[in-house]
Amino acid sequence: LQSVSALTETYEDVKRDLETKLVLIAVQDDIPVGSVRLEIRDDHTAYLSRFGVRTTNQNSGIGKSIMHLADRLMLKHGVKQIHLHTCSTVFSLIRFYYGRGFYIDSTDKSRGYVRALLIKDYDRTPVLDTKIF
């Protein structure tokens, strides 16, 4: 199993992403509890990475709120399709993303595990204009 890139990021890697990507951070009681990074590309697609919610705050709606805000921002920026990779054998992750309108496009084992490419087409999946928080 190759190393998980999120665990080997350097300060410079994080700094570069903060400067070049859209980074959303959920804060509760002045403590960061969730975040996501979004790279908007010239071809009207985006790549979602480093999405996570603090373990003690999972299943509280924070992840759904982050994803809903990400959807609204992607539409505002003219994004037609968003992509992400995740481990395809973790049912809770796949279920979460399916619930947000993603589907599995393909899988590979290039990183030592079954990694799924998930896609969400905004033309096919409406984003409900509901309250974010």
Segments from the language model and where they lie:
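Conserved GNAT-fold acetyl-CoA-binding loop/helix
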Residues: 1-16
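Hydrophobic beta-strand residues of extracellular immunoglobulin-like
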Residues: 22-25, 116
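Conserved beta-strand in the GNAT
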Residues: 25, 31-39, 47-52
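Conserved acetyl-CoA-binding loop-helix of GNAT-fold acetyltransferases
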Residues: 53, 59-72, 95-99
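Conserved GNAT acetyl-CoA-binding A-motif
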Residues: 67, 74-86
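Conserved beta-strand-loop-alpha-helix junction that forms the acyl-donor binding cleft
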Residues: 83-94, 109-115
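Terminal substrate-recognition subdomain of acyl/acetyltransferases
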Residues: 113-133
